[in-house]
Amino acid sequence: DTQGLPVELQAEKELGIKNGRKEDRTEQEIKDLVAGCKKTIKKYWKKWMQVDKDLGVSLNQDNAYWTYKDEFIEREWKLLKRAYENGVLTEGKRVVAYCPQCLTSLSHSEVNQGYHKVSDPSLFYKVKLRDEDKFLIVWTTMPFTLVTDAMIGTNPKEEYVEVKVENEIWIVGKIRLEELMQMKKIEDYQVLKTVLGSELEGKKYVHPLLDQIPELAEFAKKDNYHVVVSENFVDVNTGSGLVHLSPANGEDDYNTAIKRNVDIFSPINDEVNFTEGAGQYSGYFVRVADDKIEDDLKQRGALVKKGTIKHDYPSCWRCNTDLVWLARREYFYMLD
């Protein structure tokens, strides 16, 4: 594939092109890259010819097809046109696995090629209910997604407890209470009330970092923004039993937002850096912003517990860069 991404990456490397995936290249830069791709593919094609001979593989190399030739390109465009007309090729917005280095999304099969163990933050923080003097204890492994936070999820069928800790009332998943208290080394606490997750539905909360993110503060004025939602996918066996939902960075989160007509706030560019819409976090690569967000939570008295968690996480099979889940407008070839 002369213009395949692996070939383009190799050509960029040989040409000394950095950040070559950007769309603001000049016409001459595009021509140079195309020429570099042709040179690269022909160089390695000769090596593959020799490998075929060494393995005793008989192929008609004189009749090889090249993807940069007009007859191939025209046939591909014809097929794509037909797919679009038949509704097979569609354009839409979805959460995809995205490589910040290659600047491209990956398919499910590509994502499954690159899982490895990583250490991520395990962050417990608290948010105050707007109309009650109570705090939701929320868990996340990706602090940067607090910038795009829209909802907090509970499981409708599971039990949650209101717990008095010193002068505050915390709301946490019942089966997670004991472990959370042990992690915090809290022995003196009192369970005041037990409720189902469904009973917390619709309660509005105050995001602790709104002063840092003015655009998010505007979204927060909407009635269906920064509210508790009860959804069956919420896992009460990890964290605090409550999870924050970021439609810009999670598939379940996104689907929940679409179902509930919640607007999606996504101040993240193609390089996976926060844009001006992210306020004080503007310009940060999203994962680099994790530490600053933790510090800001701590300064506001909203950080409950910080730790680390080791888990499997996907990386790009081409460049080994950790992927980021982003809501993006993409083209999809529908197979079912």
Where are these regions (language model features)?
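Short, solvent-exposed coil/turn linker segments
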Residues: 21-24, 60, 193-199, 284-285
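Catalytic alpha/beta core of large soluble enzyme barrels
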Residues: 148-269
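Phosphate/diphosphate-binding loops
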Residues: 288-313
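Short coil/turn linker and secondary-structure boundary residues
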Residues: 25-28, 141, 172, 200, ...
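A glycine-biased structural micro-motif
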Residues: 200-202, 280-291
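N-terminal, positively charged nucleic-acid-binding surface of large information/translation enzymes
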Residues: 1-167, 246-259, 263-278, 304-336
